Structures are given as C-alpha cells and as structure tokens.
C-alpha cells in the first residue's frame, strides 16, 4: 500500500467524531483569534485610559494599517493552509510541504514590504486614513512604531494557520497567547509607569508580536510534523498561484474591512464637523465599536478556522457527510455566540464604552447610540464570515471571495456613503444592520445550495 494513502486513511480528520474534532481545532483557533483581537483592544483600553479620546481616535486612524497587514497574512496563511490540507487529503504529502514552505517565505517578504511602504509614505497615508489635524500627532507617533512590528505580525498570524494545518493547534494558540500576555503586561508599564503615552502602547504591541513570531520560527525549525527542507522554502510561482487563489477570499475580506474603515473615517470627519459632536468624537467612538466587534468576529472566524482543516481534508477525501455535519456544528456555534454578543451590545453599551476611557456626555451619547444601532443585527452576523471560510477550505475560491465581499463591499460600503447624504452622521449607524441582513441572506442561500450538492453526490 502507498504510505501516503495509509496515512490518509488513519488521519483523525477523516475518522474522528466531528464534535470532538471541531472542539479540538476550534477552541485553540478561537483563542488565537481572540488574542490577535486583544493586541488591538488592550492597546485601545490602556491608551484610552492614559491618553484619552484623542488616543482612541489615533488608534482608529491607525487600524487600517493592521487590517492591511492582516490581509497579507491571511492571504498567504489561510491560502497555504487550505492548499496544504487539500493536498494532504489527496495523499500528496511532498507537494503539500512545498506549498507550506512557499507560504512561509512569502509571509516574511510581504511583511517587510508593507512596513517599508507605510514608513515611506506615513503622513499622506494617515491623511488618507481620515486623520484630523488634532489627531495627526498621536497617529504619527503610534503608526511609526507599529510599522516596525509588521513583518513579525505577518509571520505570526500567517504562520499560525500553517501550524494548525500541521495538526498542532495547541502550539499555535500558545504562540499568540504568549505574545498577547507580554503585550498586556508591558502596556500599563510603558504607558503609565514610563509615561511613554501612546508610544508606549505601540512598543508593547511590537514586542509581543516579535515574541510570537520567534515562537513560530522555533516550531518550523524544531517541532513541525510536516517534512520541510530548505529547498522547499524557495517560493514557487505555481504554488503561490494556488495559495493566493484559496487565500484571496480572506485577504480581500480584510482589504474590504480596511476600505470601509478608511471611507468611514473620512465620512465621519466630513459629516461630524457639521454635527454637534464634531469630527473627533465620532472617529474615536467608531474605533471603539470596531474593536469591540473584533472580539465577536474573532470567535466566529476562529470557529471557521478550526473547521477548515476538517472541511478541506474530508472534501478532498470525498467524505461529504462529514463536511455537511461540520458546517452544521459550526453554524450552530456561531449563532449561539452571536446571540450572546447581541444581548451584551444592547443591554450594556455604557459599560462597554466606558472600558476604553472617559469622555464628555456627548461622547458617551454618540458611542452608546452607535453601538446599539450599528450592531443591531449581530445575532445573524456570524454565518457570513464562517461561510466564506467554508467555501475557501473546499477549494471554491470564487464563492469564498463573493462571501467575503458581501457585507463589507457590496452592501456596507455604498450604504455608508449614501445614507449620510440624507441622514447626516446618523446614516453611518443605520448602514450596519441593513448590510448585515443582506449578507446573512446571501450566505444562507449559497451555503444551502452547496451543501445540497454534496448531499446528492
């Protein structure tokens, strides 16, 4: 018997109970995603407490930098991991390892390139991202430091997807968790103890990212399960095409998020100036809500990422019943989590906003109203990102891209531009639930159609 086929037949991805298998992969993935979200949220909380509203506004202006870097990391990390699992499921171990090697090297190259571009064009980029004159000094201090850590951030985020694909979800979780703990310890020390202000928050983040990246490198040099030699680390165009094909959905989704952030910041700057709130209050408040929403999305995307090796392997092995069952379990989990977050957003908006520092009555009035209205359809908002991951993991790149684009680009982006023309700054709030409803309906339609095909196969 071919050893690859024998290994394939014994692989727990194809034979273990779906519930326990999904928990094994999803829980570490959720923790890793939450930790990645906390890199931003912990900074925002300490900066909000130590610097104030302008610090919150500055981190919101800087957020597209992190989002764009995440796009590169997910493009290569998820694309590499999805291809790796599909090839392993088909018994092509050598090709799978070559794909992983190409992804790892390209992650480093891309991270360095993004950092260089941001540092070279820092001021015009911050203006483009929506910075006001008041916020600009804070944003410049923050982003000029954050950019230094982007190569490490990109390797850490993308590399952890490959570590999970290599059947080491716990190590992947440990990589991100260690960096986040270091970041959390250093934030108050640098911001309050050393009185570095917003620069302290940035340096704490960078140091945490460096530690996470070092742990990723240690895994692939000492603890990996896959076969990987130096020759496989040279990027091959044929593999990069396959990687970008399956990673494009996740990458485009992040780019779409960045585009919405940039457009929204500029809309808030323009319409905020004509409102009672001014420009800086809406920019700061929307940044806080975006960070809070990251926690919810981190859990749903973590469930999807935990399911992806199961979906990919079993689809490659033509075990379609297991693919369908995994989708049902994942969708149920996402819906339960989404409902819990919906209740928190509606019942405790003041407490949630208050974690990120104090402000005027106008500040809290806008923040609480925005959180309640913009996140009104949270209970239905977990299916769309999960479905994008589903289609990507089974090799349906086009459907994955469509799912990734629905909420951010197809629905939310136009609504964010159109609604304020008639409703002023309040129009931004109402764009959220309408976009969520449309994206949810589309995701359900596409997913049911694809799962129906598998049932009849």
PLM features: residue spans?
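Short runs within selected transmembrane alpha-helices of multi-pass transporters and secretion channels
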Residues: 77, 146-164, 172-183, 201-214, ...
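Residue-level signal for short hydrophobic patches within transmembrane helices
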Residues: 19-38, 42, 65-72, 148, ...
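Transmembrane helical elements of multi-pass membrane transporters/channels
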Residues: 24-43, 145, 179, 208-212, ...
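Helix-terminus/linker motif at the lipid-water interface of multi-pass membrane proteins
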Residues: 34, 38-57, 126-133, 189-196, ...
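Short alpha-helical transmembrane segments in multi-pass integral membrane proteins
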Residues: 1-26, 84-151, 195-248, 311-376, ...
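Transmembrane alpha-helical segments of integral membrane proteins
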Residues: 411-420
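Transmembrane alpha-helix boundary and packing residues in multipass membrane permease domains
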Residues: 29, 33, 45, 82, ...
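Small-residue-rich hydrophobic transmembrane alpha-helices
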Residues: 56-116, 153-172, 265, 283-343, ...
């Amino acid at each position: 018997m071919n050893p690859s086929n024998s290994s394939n037949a014994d692989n727990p991805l194809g034979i273990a109970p779906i519930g326990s298998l999904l928990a094994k992969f999803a829980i570490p993935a959720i923790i890793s995603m939450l930790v990645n979200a906390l890199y931003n949220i912990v900074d925002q909380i300490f900066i909000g407490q130590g610097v104030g509203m302008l610090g919150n506004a500055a981190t919101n202006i800087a957020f597209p930098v992190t989002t764009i870097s995440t796009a590169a990391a997910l493009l290569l990390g998820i694309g590499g991991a999805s291809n790796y699992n599909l090839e392993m499921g088909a018994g092509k171990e050598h090709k799978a390892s070559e794909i992983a090697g190409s992804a790892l090297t390209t992650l480093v190259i891309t991270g360095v390139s993004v950092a260089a571009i941001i540092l070279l064009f820092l001021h015009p980029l911050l203006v483009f991202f929506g910075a006001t004159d008041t916020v600009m000094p804070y944003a410049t201090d923050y982003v000029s430091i954050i950019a230094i850590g982007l190569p490490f951030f990109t390797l850490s985020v993308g590399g952890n997807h490959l570590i999970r694909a290599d059947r080491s979800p716990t190590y992947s979780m440990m990589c991100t968790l260690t960096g986040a703990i270091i970041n959390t310890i250093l934030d108050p020390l640098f911001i309050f103890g050393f009185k570095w202000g917003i620069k302290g928050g940035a340096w704490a983040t960078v140091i945490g990212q460096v530690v996470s990246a070092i742990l990723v490198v240690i895994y692939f040099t000492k603890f990996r399960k896959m076969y990987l030699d130096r020759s496989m680390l040279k990027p091959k165009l044929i593999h990069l095409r396959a990687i970008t094909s399956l990673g494009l959905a996740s990458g485009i989704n992040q780019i779409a998020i960045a585009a919405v952030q940039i457009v929204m910041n500029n809309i808030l700057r323009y319409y905020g100036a004509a409102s009672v709130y001014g420009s800086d209050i809406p920019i700061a408040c929307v940044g806080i809500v975006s960070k809070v929403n990251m926690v919810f999305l981190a859990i749903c995307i973590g469930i999807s990422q935990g399911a992806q090796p199961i979906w990919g392997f079993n689809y490659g092995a033509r075990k379609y019943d297991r693919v369908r069952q995994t989708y049902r379990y994942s969708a149920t989990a996402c819906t339960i989590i989404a409902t819990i977050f919906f209740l928190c957003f509606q019942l405790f908006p003041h407490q949630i906003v208050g974690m990120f520092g104090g402000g005027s009555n106008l500040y809290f009035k806008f923040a609480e109203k925005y959180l309640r209205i913009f996140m009104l359809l949270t209970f239905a908002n977990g299916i769309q990102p999960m479905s994008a991951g589903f289609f990507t993991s089974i090799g349906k790149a086009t459907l994955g891209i469509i799912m990734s684009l629905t909420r951010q680009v197809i629905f939310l982006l136009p609504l964010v531009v159109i609604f304020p023309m008639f409703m002023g700054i309040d129009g931004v709030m109402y764009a959220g639930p309408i976009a969520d409803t449309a994206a949810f309906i589309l995701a359900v339609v596409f997913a049911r159609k694809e799962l129906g095909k598998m049932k009849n196969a």
